[in-house]
Swiss-Prot record:
Database matches in PROSITE patterns: RADICAL_SAM (PS51918)
Domain of life: Bacteria
UniProt name for this protein: Dual-specificity RNA methyltransferase RlmN
GO MF annotations in UniProt: 4 iron, 4 sulfur cluster binding; metal ion binding; rRNA (adenine(2503)-C2-)-methyltransferase activity; rRNA binding; tRNA (adenine(37)-C2)-methyltransferase activity; tRNA binding
Function statement: Specifically methylates position 2 of adenine 2503 in 23S rRNA and position 2 of adenine 37 in tRNAs. m2A2503 modification seems to play a crucial role in the proofreading step occurring at the peptidyl transferase center and thus would serve to optimize ribosomal fidelity.
Entry's cofactor comment: Binds 1 [4Fe-4S] cluster. The cluster is coordinated with 3 cysteines and an exchangeable S-adenosyl-L-methionine.
Gene: rlmN
Source species taxonomy: Bacteria, Pseudomonadati, Campylobacterota, Epsilonproteobacteria, Campylobacterales
Length: 357
């Protein structure tokens, strides 16, 4: 089976293609001009070279299978692999609307978008609050499949080539359990799509022994830790992984994470009604994170069919956040997006699979 050309870093292509400057030309066709056929690259490639590319490589290996649009402008994408027909998800989040001068119609500030990408089909971690775990683990995604999620979403929304995106590895799968492909994708996002590592966030459930491996790669990305509880008993009930990597183990590795000036490690905390949303939990969280340059991102549980958990009130979330902020721990409440379109991780995929049975 031919490899996808999207699986290769610029350095790898420079070693494969002769002369080596062909690699940069090919990258421009792929990531600056969105060409999806080698024949469309004839302007500066000879027929013989195009024949070589067609013989050695393939291009697109995934396609959009389904899209759902939210009333808030967000979109949930279901992608299908063209090789094995397995499906996985990504989400386009519209973070800010365009600002226009009412008198001149000049664009003062463009829209801001975040793409939430998947790195695995299914997940091995098995978090009880997450819809993805229902389908079990299928396989890791290749770097090319991660990259194509962002490319296809940009194309589908007619976003300008130069439009910068934020990339968050918060879709299906645990990034640190597919670290090689995730790191390769990050390099290609940077050199190919011109997305700065500062715009990329890796969210992990806390695979503690791989955090220093990621740190050692010096990628310059942001780190987010899915914490979700302030004691091991509660966290283990939500995240079985905690039985192997408990809170103390994870935080010990986080303390060693290299931080640029003015940067913080993000801690994601899923608020679940009557489980971890009390003021007492907020006090314990403050104590846990003492000495760590951090930011807490509160997420209100996104209800889905079959879950025993409930969404807390916005009032309780504000009390939680206000307490932490009053004590000097930066805390925000994540704005809920796409609640009307099965945006919970794995929800759209599971729905489509159920319809096929």
């Amino acid at each position: 089976m031919k490899a996808s050309v999207y699986d290769f870093t610029l350095k790898e292509l420079s070693q494969l293609l002769k002369p080596s400057f062909r690699a940069k030309q090919l990258y421009l066709w792929l990531y600056a001009k969105y060409k999806t056929s080698f024949k469309d690259m004839q302007n500066n490639f000879s027929k013989d070279f195009i024949a070589y590319l067609e013989r050695e490589f393939t291009l697109r290996t995934i396609e959009i299978a389904h899209v759902r649009k939210s009333i808030d402008g967000s979109k949930k994408y279901l992608f299908k692999s063209l090789r094995d027909n397995h499906t996985f998800e990504a989400v386009l989040l519209k973070m800010k609307d365009k600002k226009i001068d009412e008198e001149t119609n000049a664009i003062l500030e463009g829209e801001k978008y975040t793409v939430c990408v998947s790195c695995q089909i299914g997940c091995q971690v098995g978090c009880t609050f997450c819809f993805t775990q229902k389908g079990g683990f299928v396989r890791n995604l290749k770097a090319s499949e991660i990259i194509q999620q962002a490319l296809l979403i940009k194309e589908d929304n007619n976003l300008p080539i130069e439009k910068a995106l934020n990339i968050v590895f918060m879709g299906m799968g645990e990034p640190l359990n597919n670290l090689d492909e995730v790191c390769k994708a990050i390099e290609i996002f940077n050199t190919g799509m011109q997305i700065s590592p500062k715009r990329i966030t890796i969210s992990t459930s806390g695979v503690a022994d791989k955090i220093p491996i990621l740190a050692g790669k010096n990628l310059g990305v942001q780190l987010a830790i899915s914490l979700h509880a302030v004691d091991d008993k509660t966290r283990s009930s939500l995240m079985p992984l905690n039985k192997k990597y408990n809170i103390e183990c994870v935080l010990n590795e986080v303390r060693k994470w290299p931080l640029e000036q003015r940067k913080r490690v993000m801690f994601e905390y899923l608020l679940i009604k009557d489980l971890n949303d009390s003021l007492d939990c907020a006090k314990k969280l403050l104590k846990l994170l003492n000495g760590i340059k951090s930011k807490v991102n509160l997420i209100l549980f996104n209800p889905h069919e079959g879950s025993k958990f409930e969404r807390p009130s916005l009032e309780s979330a504000r009390m939680f956040a206000d307490f932490l902020n009053s004590k000097g721990l930066l805390c925000t409440i994540r704005e809920s997006k796409a609640l009307d379109i099965e945006a919970a991780c794995g929800q759209l995929r599971e729905k489509k699979l159920s319809q096929q049975i």
